[in-house]
Amino acid sequence: MNQKHGVFPEPGTIRFERLLPGPPERIWDYLTKSELKATWLSAGDVEPRVGGKVEFRFKHSDLSETDEPIPGKYRHMQDGTYFEGKVTEWDPYTKLSYTWGEATGEVSEVTYELIPQKNEKVLLILTHVHLGEDPTVLISVSAGWHTHLVILIDRLEGISPKGFWAVHNKMEEEYERLIGNK
């Protein structure tokens, strides 16, 4: 389950399911605390309330110890990138949603659902909606989330993650095949 590709339940939507080592409180901290969020996604505060600000300070080179080149089409992100969203749902240890304005310049929305499982495991369901239908955007966003989730799992399991761009490049190729065949 933890390496499966995301699925596209409807146009402009990507959904991932991952089984994570819990408990839910631990996963919630990785979603909402800047110092933990920075280890797998991006630094930035999350104001703990509906309507609260969510900061995204991306610097992909900080997500692993690996020094690797940034692909040419992402070179504009070399020194990092910043944007903000707003919390649209805040149900601690269960569900977090916020707006996301980076992919197309349009506002999309990300939802994380945490479902407790046996043996201190947590099923994470990540859904990103309102992405539009541009295949280039869908490929990039799908590969990005897939890569960030690989890094999250490594962090939760105490493993040093592989370089972001090496994984992302591979995932982009795979999602290009998947989306190109839709």
Model feature map: region roles:
Residues 1-49, 53:
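Hydrophobic ligand-binding cavity/cleft-lining segments
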Residues 15, 35-80, 166-170:
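Short beta-edge strand/loop motif at the mouth of beta-sheet-based domains
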Residues 18, 44, 82-88, 109-116:
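Hydrophobic/aromatic beta-strand elements that line small-molecule binding cavities or substrate pockets
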Residues 24-25, 47-50, 88-94, 113-123:
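A short, structured loop/turn motif at beta-sheet edges
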Residues 27, 37, 54, 87, ...:
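Hydrophobic pocket/interface hotspot
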Residues 54-56, 71-74, 97-103, 126:
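Short beta-strand segments that buttress and anchor functional surface loops
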Residues 99-152:
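Beta-strand/loop substructures that line and gate deep hydrophobic ligand-binding cavities in soluble
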Residues 129-182:
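A conserved amphipathic terminal alpha-helix motif
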